[in-house]
From Swiss-Prot:
Residues 1-126 form the Peptidase C39 domain. It is found in: Cell inner membrane. This is Leukotoxin translocation ATP-binding protein LktB. It is a multi-pass membrane protein. Its main location: membrane. Homodimer. Its EC number is 7.4.2.5. NCBIfam families: type_I_sec_HlyB (TIGR01846). Residues 155-437 form the ABC transmembrane type-1 domain. Part of the ABC transporter complex LktBD involved in leukotoxin export. Transmembrane domains (TMD) form a pore in the inner membrane and the ATP-binding domain (NBD) is responsible for energy generation. Belongs to the ABC transporter superfamily. Protein-1 exporter (TC 3.A.1.109) family.
Length: 708
């Protein structure tokens, strides 16, 4: 009833969905109690105040249909009749609008006429205040600006060194001019000796300063690289579980590897070339003093370089995008193949997998070749412009020398100066592929860094939990357009109670425990522990006090001791051994040559399935959690391993609230209470013998199937 009542207030439904989109939890009943004073639904003012209370920045605007593509989406289309809906995307090419019908609880695609018929011109734009103050600041090239400001002293030193290098670059052509016009004409050997010594000193200083600049610059960019790498890994581990469930492992790995491209760009010659290019204006002034005509030729070539880059860049970027996509596909396929190597060998499907790999690899190589060809064409175009300018300057310069407007020394000095000007331009043009590549890398890495993390700030860190659990009116789905997984679930679990949860696959058993661990926030209702709403709790505080054992547990490539004591590497050995004994793992660990120091291999490959599972149980017990979840923890074990664990189950459950999820009913028959789920709802609950008395019940049916 409460879910249906909330559905009648579409403003509250919209606020709930937009809050979830911005990774902000809320209690709809609490919002309704505070802001829906007359019980008729949230008014416009009440809606804006409710959004503000959730740290959302909401703004009511009036916008013409033709300008909707300019606003930040999703946004709430406010209707005076209460039939609000969400505007998710505007397709300007096809004049279509992706909306979400809050009343029907389903997405819709509307034509221009259909949208205009229901649009009243009112829109509520919603953004997270965290993004406004920079907590969710977008990762792009502007991210590096604070880093540059932070290390401004080092970059200032680099700038000063660059100024001296440019001064030395000016002196060298002047020396050559003096030698050509004065020394050779007047046979001044003493002057030649002085100039030679001075030139040698300048060259030595230039080499030393150039090396010093490269060192200082590389040192500072390495610091930025370390900061970015650390930020990336912290952010990756802070992302919600839904981020990883919606993406292939290979895609995520490929995006993280783009950090290498950014690193190469930061530590390469591209940025120093940019500095050199900035000082080119000084050279232009000196070159203009020598010959305005020749300088105009050089200046006239610069638009040619720019136009050529503008022509090549979009094509190159598209090809780089395609290259990355194919590289990510290869990465994902490789990770998938290595992970599933046992299945591949068992089914003898290596030829099929190899054939798929060969096709994908050929596609990637072809894409990479197209990038190389286009980059080569771009570089040769730059060379063509450079050679053409050189020929024009040679012809025009020779005419100026013959006519007496320019000396031979001045012509040589001018050509040397023009080389100093053009060199960074050419380097930048040749490095344009790197610029495009790093742009792609920043965008791909932004997919990780721009994804909102789980919110920890402002969350409650409560005292040690006791173990009372309450699910109230829970309604949940994994995506807005996905089917409902849990519907109106109400469940009270008392402290110290052992609860078994059974049901068909897909009935929502594991989803309940994911909500309990706050991996997800329910669309409606509350999950409470000791009366505290988990939507307001710090996820780390919560998860440290819950022990979880899954069907397929992952062990890290470390020693058994390190795996058990993963949450507290410095814990006493006595606690590790006690947890191992409780899990029935101590005996087989003691028989290993290295005992608790045995390296288990990647994902525990050096151990049997039963051994891995018992270590996982020990890992879950070592912190003495007040809530323990066994999610199909024994379903894949042999009977001996399961028997060992079940023998210790009474000790394991002592003083804890335990939730046992199982398909094998023998695992839960001794539970204090058994919950039977079907299609996201609780259909039966009671003790084993009580449920068997209902011969028409689902539990009795499942029990009969297992007996047969």
């Amino acid at each position: 009833m409460e879910a249906n009542h909330q559905r009648n207030d579409l403003g509250l439904v919209a606020l709930t969905m937009l809050a979830q989109y911005h990774n902000i939890s809320l209690n709809p009943e609490e919002i309704k109690h505070k802001f829906d004073l007359d019980g008729k639904g949230l008014s416009l003012t009440a809606w804006l105040l409710a959004a503000k209370s959730l740290a959302l920045k909401a703004k009511h605007i009036k916008k013409e249909v033709s300008r909707l593509h300019l606003v930040n989406l999703p946004a709430l289309v406010w209707q005076d009749n209460g039939k609000h809906f969400l505007l998710v995307k505007v397709d300007t090419d096809n004049n279509r609008y992706l909306t979400y019908d809050l009343e029907k609880d389903a997405p819709q695609i509307l034509s221009q006429d259909e949208f205009e018929a229901c649009y009243q011109g009112q829109l509520i734009l919603v953004t997270s205040r965290a993004s406004v103050v920079g907590q969710l600041a977008k990762f792009d090239f502007t991210w590096f600006i604070p880093a540059v400001i932070k290390y401004r002293k080092i970059f200032l030193e680099t700038l000063i060194v660059s100024i001296f290098l440019q001064i030395f670059a000016l002196i060298t052509p002047l020396f050559f001019q003096v030698v050509m016009d004065k020394v050779l004409v007047h046979r001044g050997f003493s002057t030649l000796n002085i100039i030679t010594v001075a030139l040698a000193i300048v060259i030595i200083f230039e080499i030393v300063l150039s090396g010093l600049r490269t060192y200082v610059f590389s040192h500072s960019t390495s610091r930025i690289d370390v900061e970015l790498g650390a930020k990336l890994f912290r952010h990756l581990l802070s992302l919600p579980i839904s981020y990883f469930e919606n993406r292939r492992v290979g895609d995520t790995v490929a995006r993280v590897r783009e950090l290498d491209q950014i690193r190469n760009f930061l530590t390469g010659q591209a940025l120093t070339s940019v500095l050199d290019l900035l000082f080119s204006f000084i050279f232009f002034a000196v070159m203009w003093y020598y010959s305005p005509k020749l300088t105009l030729v050089i200046l006239g070539s610069l638009p040619c370089y720019i136009l050529w880059s503008i022509f090549i860049s979009p094509i190159l970027r598209r090809r780089l995008d395609d290259k990355f996509a194919r590289s990510a596909d290869n990465q994902a396929f490789l990770v998938e193949s290595v992970t599933a190597i046992n299945m591949i060998k068992a089914m003898a499907v290596a030829p099929q997998m190899t054939d798929t790999w060969d096709k994908q690899l050929a596609s990637y190589v072809s894409s990479s070749f197209r990038v190389t060809v286009l980059a080569t064409i771009g570089q040769q175009g730059v060379q063509l412009i450079q050679k053409t300018v050189m020929v024009i300057n040679l012809w025009l310069g020779a005419h100026l020398v013959i006519s007496g407007d320019l000396s031979i020394g001045q012509l040589i000095a001018f050509n040397m100066l023009s080389g100093q000007v053009i060199a960074p331009v050419i380097r930048l043009a040749q490095l344009w592929q790197d610029f495009q590549q790093v742009g792609i890398s920043v965008t791909r890495l932004g997919d990780v860094l721009n994804s909102p993390t789980e919110q920890y700030q402002g969350k409650l860190s409560l005292p040690e939990i006791k173990g009372d659990i309450s699910f109230k009116n829970i309604r949940f789905r994994y995506k807005p357009d996905a089917p409902t997984i849990l519907n109106n679930v109400n469940l009270e679990i008392r402290q110290g109670e052992v609860i078994g949860i059974v049901g068909r696959s897909g009935s929502g058993k594991s989803t309940l425990t994911k909500l309990l661990q706050r991996f997800y926030i329910p669309e409606n209702g509350q999950v409470l522990i000791d009366g505290h709403d988990l939507a307001l709790a710090d996820p780390n505080w919560l998860r440290r006090q819950i022990g979880v054992v899954l069907q397929d547990n992952v062990l890290l490539n470390r020693s058994i001791r390190e795996n058990i004591a993963l949450s507290d590497p410095g814990m006493p050995m006595e606690r590790v051994i006690y947890a191992a004994k409780l899990a029935g793992a101590h005996d087989f660990i003691s028989e290993l040559r290295e005992g608790y120091n045995t390296i288990v291999g990647e994902q525990g490959a050096g151990l049997s399935g039963g051994q891995r599972q018992r270590i996982a149980i020990a890992r879950a017990l070592v912190n003495n959690p007040k809530i323990l979840i066994f999610d199909e923890a024994t379903s894949a074990l042999d009977y001996e391993s399961e028997h060992i664990i079940m023998q210790n189950m009474q000790k394991i459950c002592q003083g804890r609230t335990v939730i046992l999820i199982a398909h094998r009913l023998s695992t839960v028959k001794n539970a204090d209470r058994i919950i039977v789920m079907e299609k996201g709802e609780i259909v039966e609950q009671g003790k084993h013998h009580e449920l068997l008395q209902n011969s028409n019940g689902l539990y009795s049916y499942l029990h009969q199937l297992q007996l047969n």
